[in-house]
């Protein structure tokens, strides 16, 4: 391997990516190896490096010190001529004066044998700590939001006007496509397939704690938003085919049983647990179809393009079947897609950029209400989480062929 001082800018960029510091690739795109090892703390107090990381570049500087030691770079060389260092010695002469006699010091290449103190970087914690306690809190948050949603559906159901009094609102999609009775079952089957694929993929992920924590935070927030939108505006049923459950008129015991039945059935019509009306704005089915696809694509290798396309088709067909069944207004689906994709992209943009994890006047994303919980969940995650997989089960993997293809331990990102 070439010494660091001879590295090209491309080699420097590759080294940054290998060490999970992609945020430095753009500011250091023209840096050679010599420029890299010459970086000091002062460089991180000036633009553009001062805007990259919240730790003043300490992690990168520690990695550079480690790199110097790995390649035996000597930071404190004494610049002497080649060969043995000649030392001048005063020798008295017969006339009482002194002459200088040159003696070699016996050290090759003219270096003095001196003790050099090399700063050793402190042993830092893992860049991607699991922190299962935080993941459990995120799970409780998502579970609470899901339970609150079922309670809100039961409350809103009591306010939905009868379809004979308030007919369905006009909808452009309904004007062009007649209702297909079995379409909503296709939607829910696609959703269950996507959730199953995501669960299998999650089990094989190396950093499953971090990724599941992100999933719970996002899905919990989406269902919390849904509680608000369905409560503040109650829309009439989107079709005359709806047969809503009878209203209970304050019978809290019956409402509690209905809520428990809805939770046990996962809120799905295909399980017979969901026969209430009013939970239209916005579509929870669209949320799950969209969010599972986004997580599947984000945390799987780019080379599995066929897998991404299959999941995308399942998601798109499922969303189309929601409308084809006339079980949601078009605006319900549009709003659900918009909120889901934006929240997913905002969260991951903030999680992948260290500078966005620190509140400042320049960071406008720090003004969202969920920024403090975000900081708590993500503050110890350094950089982009690799798409790394491992076998989580005690029994070994069975190879179907004698020819084993070796690949990098870390999956392509």
UniProtKB/Swiss-Prot annotation:
Source species, domain of life: Eukaryota
Keywords linked to the UniProt accession: Apoptosis, Golgi apparatus, Kinase, Lipid metabolism, Membrane, Phosphoprotein, Sphingolipid metabolism, Transferase, Transmembrane, Transmembrane helix
Cross-referenced InterPro entries: SAM, SAM/pointed_sf, Sphingomyelin_synth-like, Sphingomyelin_synth-like_dom
Record's catalysed reaction(s): an N-acylsphing-4-enine + a 1,2-diacyl-sn-glycero-3-phosphocholine = a sphingomyelin + a 1,2-diacyl-sn-glycerol; an N-acylsphinganine + a 1,2-diacyl-sn-glycero-3-phosphocholine = an N-acylsphinganine-1-phosphocholine + a 1,2-diacyl-sn-glycerol; an N-acyl-(4R)-4-hydroxysphinganine + a 1,2-diacyl-sn-glycero-3-phosphocholine = an N-acyl-(4R)-4-hydroxysphinganine-phosphocholine + a 1,2-diacyl-sn-glycerol; 1-(9Z-octadecenoyl)-2-acyl-sn-3-glycerol + a sphingomyelin = a 1-(9Z-octadecenoyl)-2-acyl-sn-glycero-3-phosphocholine + an N-acylsphing-4-enine
Keyword Transferase attributed: yes
Major site of localization recorded for this protein: Golgi
One GO CC term on file: Golgi membrane
Membrane topology: Multi-pass membrane protein
Phosphoserine PTM positions: 8
Effect of substituting residue 285 to A: Completely abolishes enzyme activity. No change in subcellular location
Stated regulation of activity: Inhibited by bacterial PC-phospholipase C inhibitor D609.
GO biological process: apoptotic process; ceramide biosynthetic process; regulation of intrinsic apoptotic signaling pathway; sphingolipid biosynthetic process; sphingomyelin biosynthetic process
Cross-referenced CDD domains: PAP2_like, SAM_SGMS1
MF (Gene Ontology): ceramide cholinephosphotransferase activity; ceramide phosphoethanolamine synthase activity; kinase activity; sphingomyelin synthase activity
Top EC category: transferase
Chain ranges on the Cytoplasmic side, renumbered to this chain: 325-413
EC id: 2.7.8.27
Localization in the cell: Golgi apparatus membrane
Pfam family, one: PAP2_C
SAM domain ranges (all copies): 7-70
Transmembrane spans: 136-156, 184-204, 215-235, 276-296, 304-324
Pathway: Sphingolipid metabolism
The family this protein is said to belong to: Belongs to the sphingomyelin synthase family.
Note: Overexpression of the human protein in mouse causes increased non-HDL-sphingomyelin and non-HDL cholesterol levels, decreased HDL-sphingomyelin and HDL-cholesterol levels and increases the atherogenic potential of non-HDL lipoprotein particles.
Name the record gives this protein: Phosphatidylcholine:ceramide cholinephosphotransferase 1
